[in-house]
C-alpha cells in the first residue's frame, strides 16, 4: 500500500529502423516516474508565483513520484506547506518518506473541503472518484492550480476554471464539458513560449497533464542504452 502500483505495465521496445525487438520491460517504474515527472513539470510551469501550499490526495506510487520530481526542481530553501488527506496510514507514511526535507511542513486533514480550502496547488492521484471531490466551488481559491493526474472527480471545475491545459487534446476532447471549457491549450504551446503560462496570479487553472506514450518510449530507450553500453 502506498508504494505498490495499482496498475501493472509492460513495454516492448523495438528498433524502429529494422523492427527488431530489443527488450521486454517491466514498465511499472517508468509509468509512475514519467507520470510524476510530467505532473511536476505542469506544477512548476503553471503554479502561481506565490504558491506555497500544496495539497495531495491519493498518496500511492504516483503521488510519491510526483513529490520526488517536484522536490528536484523547486528551490530547496522554499518553505512548503504540504496538506495530505487522511486515508488509513498513507498520509503518515507519505510524510515520513519525505521527513528529511526540512522545508516541508506536513498537515493531515480529514475531509475534502479542508484539503481544497486555501491550497495553491491541488494534486489528485486517486484511481477512483465516483462523485465530485469537492462540490463547493467557492473553496477553490483564486490562483489555484488543479492537477488531477487520474482526471476523475473535478467535472465541476471544468466549467468555471479560467483555463484548461492538457498535454494532448485527445486526452480531454471526450470529456463531458470539453466544449464548455472557458479556454483550452496544450502544454507544449506554453513550453514553446507561444502562449504565457499564466495571464495572472488569480487565474484558476486545471492541468490535465498525465503523460504520453512517447514519454514511456523515451524513458525505456535511455534505460536500454545504459544497460547495454
Q: For the regions a protein language model found, what residue spans apply to each?
A:
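NAD(P)-binding Rossmann-fold cofactor-contacting core
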Residues: 73-98
